């Protein structure tokens, strides 16, 4: 049995120094090919207007835009400091005309019903203050037939995998945050139970050595 979840902050990553460290870490993951752009695309999210929840510095969504044609993206993040970094990175990518970042949380998204062709997120699920409500909001803003991709760490990963992630995390200042994220993450069984009485109940939950994933369609 894994240890009980230790709930992490739902206030987002704030502070110029902290945000800069996180941006450096995410940029290194991108450069190593360790962000999940291919997984998002392989899930069928390849066209139209997508919503990314918790984009952080923006690399997953920006890489998705880079590798798809004619797509548009809105990023929803609670952190003003992180949005500023994401906007700077979008400018670096030359993609400012295709992406807009909005400051809000997932409990009451500032978007119309049936607005998006897809919703995706990586690494934010464990931070959601009211995950069931956020899942229902995802369903609300999706068009009929719209696709869903949610991925995150898993709390019950093998100790060896946790050690590997810890040692691979650079800069080293990010390591305490990694551990707190793992401790707050869901197991695949917990995620299956969590979605049972939400609009995402028909979605598929799967796992790998370090993470959990939810995919489906409206």
Labelled PLM ranges:
Residues 1-45, 63:
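Conserved class I S-adenosyl-L-methionine
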Residues 51, 57-108:
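Class I SAM-dependent methyltransferase SAM/SAH-binding core
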Residues 95-96, 112, 201:
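Conserved H-loop
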Residues 118-129:
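A short SAM/SAH-binding and catalytic strip from SAM-dependent methyltransferases
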Residues 132-144:
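A short glycine-rich, Lys/Arg-flanked "PGG" loop and its adjoining helix->strand segment in the class I
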Residues 151-214:
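C-terminal alpha-helical "lid/dimerization" subdomain adjacent to the S-adenosyl-L-methionine
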């Amino acid at each position: 049995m894994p240890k009980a979840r230790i709930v992490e902050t739902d206030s987002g990553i704030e502070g110029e120094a902290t945000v800069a460290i996180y941006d450096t870490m995410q940029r290194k993951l991108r450069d190593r090919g360790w962000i999940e752009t291919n997984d998002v695309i392989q899930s069928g999210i390849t066209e139209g207007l997508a919503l990314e929840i918790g984009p952080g510095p923006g690399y997953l969504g920006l890489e998705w835009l880079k590798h798809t044609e004619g797509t548009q993206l809105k990023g929803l993040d609670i952190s003003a400091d992180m949005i500023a970094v994401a906007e700077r990175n979008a400018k670096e990518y030359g993609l400012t005309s295709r992406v807009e970042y909005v400051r809000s949380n997932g409990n009451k998204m500032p978007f119309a019903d049936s607005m998006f062709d897809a919703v995706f997120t990586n690494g934010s699920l464990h931070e959601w203050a009211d995950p069931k409500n956020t899942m229902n909001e995802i369903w609300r803003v999706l068009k009929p037939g719209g696709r869903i991709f949610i991925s995150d760490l898993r709390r019950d990963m093998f100790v060896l995998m946790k050690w590997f992630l810890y040692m691979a995390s650079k800069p080293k200042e990010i390591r305490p945050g990694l551990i707190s994220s793992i401790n707050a993450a869901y197991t695949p069984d917990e995620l299956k139970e969590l979605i049972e009485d939400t609009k995402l109940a028909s979605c598929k939950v799967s796992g790998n050595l370090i993470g959990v994933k939810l995919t489906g369609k409206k």
